[in-house]
């Protein structure tokens, strides 16, 4: 197993190198910063272990640029709940706060190694379905109230802002609103503001004419135009660069765009749904988000409760995911023991549905018996 360690602290980096030298089945390549790692990472690597707080580029931005190509583990000396949640959102398998026992990190590495080896031996005929992005897997009183609000606003053209923690299902709600609207037969286009580098975001949204910049060898339609007559979903809207917010405000108000390198405006007919897990009042007070744009986008706010407030959904979602994974990998039927079920119900799920689905998939693969035990979940309570 080939592992990249990205750590700016030379003492920590050397300590990990020395510790892992004792493991004959692990090949370690260390980097002092994400930039060096990005230049060298290739298909031969299986796992990336990265710090978060590093100069020039932090670990979370580094992971976003990797786009899930590698399994990942985060180590940091300044852990916060928000960083842990952001890590889960980016698909990080484990999160260690310094100082930590290297033996625990090693255990996490070998769990990941076992999953990767299993997946290589049992390649899927087709990727696991992701129904959580397009439909609701379970029901609860809190969820039904949010669905009622979404259904009511779907028949209108009002802009909607979906509020809630990362992983609660905001994209599911965006699809739900689109599917129950008069625009359902037209495009639904989603764009994550934090997933596209800032220097590319404007051209992706607005499009460009030939010659607008060095690499613009042909005209390209932007996402706003592509969504015409349909819905555009602006995920993580709070991360939109400030200088682009004024341009978005004009699009929302005037329903027209101008491609880069052009002086001619184009009318568009789109419905805006945005989503965020940020405190927008704080963003506005800090002058990181325009208040006028906020009011234009949040005509109808819908708050989606976190999974820990929708406890009755946890086991149904877990059981659906467990069956899906077992069927996909031909593992035979598996179930949760009473203790495992109790653990799932009592865990806080700061990563919400996204975290739950990942935990269940890992447990299904790693468990040796037909009944998944609490120890197979690897959840700290």
Curated annotation (Swiss-Prot):
Keywords of this protein's UniProt record, alphabetized?
Answer: ATP-binding, DNA-binding, Nucleotide-binding, Phosphoprotein, Transcription, Transcription regulation, Two-component regulatory system
Q: How is it modified after translation?
A: Phosphorylated by FlgS.
What region holds the Sigma-54 factor interaction domain? Answer: 136-365
The answer to whether keyword Transmembrane helix applies is: no
- Pfam families the record matches: Response_reg, Sigma54_activat
- Where do the annotations place ATP binding? 164-171, 227-236
- Note the InterPro entries from the entry: AAA+_ATPase (IPR003593), CheY-like_superfamily (IPR011006), P-loop_NTPase (IPR027417), Sig_transdc_resp-reg_receiver (IPR001789), Sigma_54_int (IPR002078), Sigma_54_int_dom_ATP-bd_1 (IPR025662), Sigma_54_int_dom_ATP-bd_2 (IPR025943)
One GO CC term on file: protein-DNA complex
Write down which residues bear the modification named 4-aspartylphosphate: 51
Keyword check for DNA-binding: yes
The GO molecular function terms of this record are: ATP binding; ATP hydrolysis activity; cis-regulatory region sequence-specific DNA binding; DNA-binding transcription activator activity
Residue span(s) of domain Response regulatory: 2-113
Q: What SMART domains is this protein classified in?
A: AAA (SM00382), REC (SM00448)
Give the record's GO biological process terms: phosphorelay signal transduction system; positive regulation of DNA-templated transcription
> What if the gene is knocked out?
Disruption leads to loss of motility due to the failure of the mutant strain to express the RpoN-dependent flagellar genes.
Q: What does this protein do?
A: Member of the two-component regulatory system FlgR/FlgS that induces the transcriptional induction of the genes needed in motility and flagellar biogenesis. Upon phosphorylation by FlgS, functions as a transcriptional regulator and activates transcription of RpoN-dependent flagellar genes.
Protein name per its UniProtKB record = Transcriptional regulatory protein FlgR
Q: Which organism is it from?
A: Helicobacter pylori (strain ATCC 700392 / 26695)
Gene field? flgR
């Amino acid at each position: 197993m080939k592992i990249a360690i990205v750590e700016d602290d030379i003492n920590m980096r050397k300590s990990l190198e020395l510790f892992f030298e004792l493991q004959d089945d692990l090949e370690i390549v260390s980097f002092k910063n994400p930039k060096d790692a990005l230049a060298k990472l290739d298909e031969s690597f299986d796992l990336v272990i990265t710090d978060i707080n590093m100069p020039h580029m932090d670990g979370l931005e580094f992971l976003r640029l990797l786009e899930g190509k590698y399994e990942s583990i985060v180590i940091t000396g300044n852990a916060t709940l928000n960083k842990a949640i952001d890590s889960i959102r980016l698909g990080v398998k484990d999160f260690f706060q310094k100082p930590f026992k290297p033996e625990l990190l090693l255990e996490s590495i070998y769990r990941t190694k076992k999953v990767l080896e299993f997946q290589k031996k049992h390649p899927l005929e087709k990727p696991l379905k992701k129904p959580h992005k397009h439909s609701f897997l379970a029901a609860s009183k809190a969820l039904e109230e949010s669905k009622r609000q979404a259904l009511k606003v779907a028949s209108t053209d009002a802009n909607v802002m979906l509020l809630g923690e990362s992983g609660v299902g905001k994209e599911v709600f965006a699809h739900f609103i689109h599917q129950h609207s008069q625009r359902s037969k037209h495009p639904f286009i989603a764009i994550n503001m934090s997933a596209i580098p800032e220097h590319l975001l404007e051209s992706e949204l607005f499009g460009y004419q030939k010659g607008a910049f060095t690499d613009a060898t042909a005209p390209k339609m932007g996402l706003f135009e592509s969504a015409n007559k349909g819905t555009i979903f602006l995920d993580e809207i709070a991360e939109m660069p400030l200088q682009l917010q004024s341009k978005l405000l004009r699009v929302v108000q005037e329903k027209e765009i101008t491609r880069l390198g052009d002086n001619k405006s184009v009318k568009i007919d789109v419905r805006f749904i945005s989503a965020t897990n940020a405190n927008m009042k704080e963003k506005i007070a800090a002058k990181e988000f325009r208040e006028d744009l906020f009011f234009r986008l949040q005509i109808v706010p819908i708050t989606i409760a976190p999974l820990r407030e929708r406890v009755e959904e946890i086991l149904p979602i877990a059981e659906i995911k467990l069956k899906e994974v077992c069927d996909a990998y031909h593992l035979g039927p598996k179930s949760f023991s009473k203790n495992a079920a109790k653990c799932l119900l009592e865990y806080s799920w700061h990563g919400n549905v996204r975290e739950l689905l990942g935990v269940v998939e890992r447990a299904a693969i790693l468990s040796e018996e037909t009944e998944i035990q609490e120890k197979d979940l690897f959840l700290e309570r």
